[in-house]
Amino acid sequence: MLQYIFLVNYYFRLDAAIMSALRHKNLICKLLGSFNHSKFYFSTSKFVYTTKKEVIKIGGVSKALKVPKNPELVPKNYLPKNIPTETIRDLKWMMQKDSLGQDIFLLGRPGPLRRLLTQQYLELTKREMEYVALSRDTTESDLKQRREILSGTAHYMDQAAVRAALEGRVLVLEGIEKVERNVLPVLNNLLENREMHLEDGRLLIPAARYDSLLAEHGAEVMEKWRLMRVSEDFRVIALGLPVPKYTGSPLDPPLRSRFQARNIQHLPYAQQLDVIISLAPNVDKEVLSRLLSFSHTLLTEESSGLGLLDFPMENLVTGLPIYNSVPELTPLDFISRFYPYKLFLPSDGQKSVEDTLQTFHISSQGNKIKRLSIESVSRSSENPHSVEVEIKVGNKVRSLTVNGGTSVNTSKDFVTTPYHSWLMADILLSHSTSDICVVGPRGCGKSALVRNLGDLLGYKIETIQLYQDMTARDLLQQRTTTDTGDTVWRLSPLVNAALNGQLAVLDGLHRVHKGSLAVIQRLVHDRELQLYDGTRLLSETSFKTLMQELNLSKEELEGRGIRMVHPAFRIIALAEPPTTGTGKGQWLTPEILSMFLYHDMRSLSQTEELQVITEMTGTPGSILPEMLRVTHALRNSEDAALRSVATSLSTRQLLRVGRRLQKFPEESVYSVVNKACLARFLPALAKDTLDKVLEKNGIKQVKTIEDKNIQCVIQDQVLTIGNFRICLIKISDCMPTFYA
C-alpha cells in the first residue's frame, strides 16, 4: 500500500513547468487550427456543417461538435432564427475561451440575458448543462457531494460540480455574488488544476495526468487508488453581477483569476427597435421608439447616479404582446407595469423619471386609462387550459387568450367595485404574458382579489406564505426522512403548482430574503428548474422538442428525471409597498424588478369601503360610517404614529369589526376602535393622540354599568353567559381518550 501511495505522490509532484508547457502546447495547436476539416461557414439564420465531421465556425473561430451522451441535458429552443450581430460577437468570444480550455465569467445587469446567452451557446455547441442557482443557503455539499441514507446505509451522491467534471459537461453557476465567501473556494483547485478531493475518498485529477497513469499502471490500479478522470470537455461558466454597483460579495482575487470575464450588454438601440417593431406591429412605430429611448435612458450612468433602478429591458420584450393586443393603452399604462417608479422612488427620483418621460413626450399621452373592464370569460373549445377573455377598453372590445385552469369555482365573498373591475382587467392583461406582483398596503384586499381572479379563470390556488428566514430549500425542495429512516426530497408547494398547472400565490414577497428568492428566477423567466435531487423541469416547448427528437414518451422522459412545467402555471406575488429610497424596507431590487409585471393596489376609499363592508356583513346603523370616518382620518394623518395605528384598521380588520357589530350592535365606536388598535398597549403619547382624534370626530368613551348578576347556564347543549349564547360541540363517543 505504501508503494502505491509513493507512486501517486511521485506522479503528482511532476515538475509544474513541464505540465504547464504541455498544456500551452495543446492550446497553441488548437489556435493554429490543427483541425483537419473541409470548408464550413456561419450564418445568422442557420448553421451549416461538413459531412465528415460536424464543425461550427463563427468568424475565424471553429469548434468540433460531439454527440452528447445525454441529449436531454442540452438546452433547447434558445437559439433564434436570426441571431443579432451583438450576440454573435458574444458567442464567438465564448467559443474562443472554450477552445482554449478556459472557464468563463459573464457579468452584466440583472435579468435573464446572461443565462440566455449561456444556454444559446450550449445549444449551439450541443453541450450538456449542469445548473446551480447560488444563494446564501448554498453549502459545500450542494456543489460536491451530499450524504444520503439508503436502506440504513450512508451513501455519497455526486452533485452538479462533480457530475459535470466526470461527464464533461458545462457547470453553470448563477448568482456568484450571493453565495457565502467560504463556499466557492472549494472549487478553486477544480478550476485551476482540475483536481478535487471528494468526501467518499475519491480524487479527481486532470485528464492528461490520468491517461498517463492509466497507460503505465492499468485500470485496476487506478481503481484501487480511487482516482477519477476529469473530462477535458469540462468547463465552468459563472454568471454574476458587478459588485459594488450591485449588492453582494465580491469575488476573492484567487478565485477571480480563474475566470475569463466579459461584460454582457443589451442589444444596441437600432437592433432592439427592429425587434420590438416586429413584436408589436399594431402599435405606432413612433410610440415604440419613444418607449425604447426612455428605457435606454434609465440604463445610463447618469440615471444610476440619481439612484434610479435599472429598467428591466427583457420585460419590455415580454410585455409587448399586451400592447399589440390592446393598442388603446397609453404608453404610461405600458411602462408602469415594468417600472412602477412611484412605488420605490422618493419624490426627487420620481421627478427625475417624470422629466425623462416628458422629454420623450410620454407623459403627455395622458394618465392611466380609466375605462377598462372584463366583458366576458369563456372556456376555449380547443385547449382546456385556455380561456377566451373579452376586455372593454374605452369604447372598443378586445379579445385575449390567456392561461387558465379546469376548475369551476364561484366567488361568493367578493364584492366588486368599479375600481376592482378596472384593476382585475388590468391584471388580466399582464396575466396573458407574464407572472405578476400585486403591491398594496396590508389588508387592502390583495388576497381576495387574487382568489377572485383564480375563480374567474378556473385555477386551483396554491398559496405559499413567505417569511424572512425562508431558505431556498423551502421554496423548491425540502429534505425529510421516511418511516425507515431513509432521506428523501419532498417537492415544495411551488414546484407542485408548476407541475400541476396551478396558480401559485407568493404571499409576502417583501418579507423573504432577496438572495433566497433568486433561486426561482429561472422558473420565472424560462419555466425551467433544476432541483436538489437532480430532477429537471423543462418548459412545455422544450419538453415536446425532446420527445420528438429522442422519440421518447412522456413517461420515458420522466424516468430520466425530466418533467414538464404545466403550460397553465402562473405566479402571482403579493407584497406591501417598499420604503422609498435605499432603507431597510426597500425590497424591490433590480433583480426582483426584472421578475414580474407590477400592479399597484391602493386602499379603498371611504365610500368603496362602506359598500364592501355593508354587502359582506350587512351591518346597519350609523356606527360603521363613524368608524370609517375615524379610520380614514388616521390614514390621512400627517403624524407617523397615527398612520402606524391606522394599519390596525385595514379593510380586513374592518370586516371583522363589521361582523362583530352585526352580533353585538350595542357596542360603542370608541370601544371598537380601541380594541382593534390594541390601545391599551400603545405608548402614552400615541394613546393620547388617538383619543384626541376620536374626540375631534365626536367619539367619546361611554361608561358601561357592570352587571353583577351574570349567570352561566348550560341547557340543551347551549352555553349562556349573560346575554351571550353559544352552541357547545358534542364530543363523539368514538373519539380516543388520553387518560385512564
Segments the model singles out, each with a brief description of its role:
Residues 95-96, 150-171, 220-228, 482-504, ...:
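Conserved alpha-helical scaffold flanking the Walker A/P-loop in AAA+ ATPase domains
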Residues 124-151, 456-483:
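AAA+/P-loop NTPase substrate/partner-engagement loops
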Residues 86, 94-101, 164-166, 427-433, ...:
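Phosphate-binding P-loop
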Residues 102, 167-171, 231-237, 434, ...:
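Loop/turn-to-beta-strand initiation segments
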Residues 103-134, 435-465, 740:
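Walker A/P-loop
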Residues 20-23, 27-84, 91-92, 232-235, ...:
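Alpha-helical lid/collar subdomain of P-loop NTPases
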Residues 127, 189, 232, 248-267, ...:
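A short helix-turn-beta junction within AAA+ P-loop NTPase domains corresponding to the substrate/partner-engaging
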Residues 180-231, 241, 253, 480, ...:
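Conserved catalytic/switch belt of AAA+ P-loop NTPases
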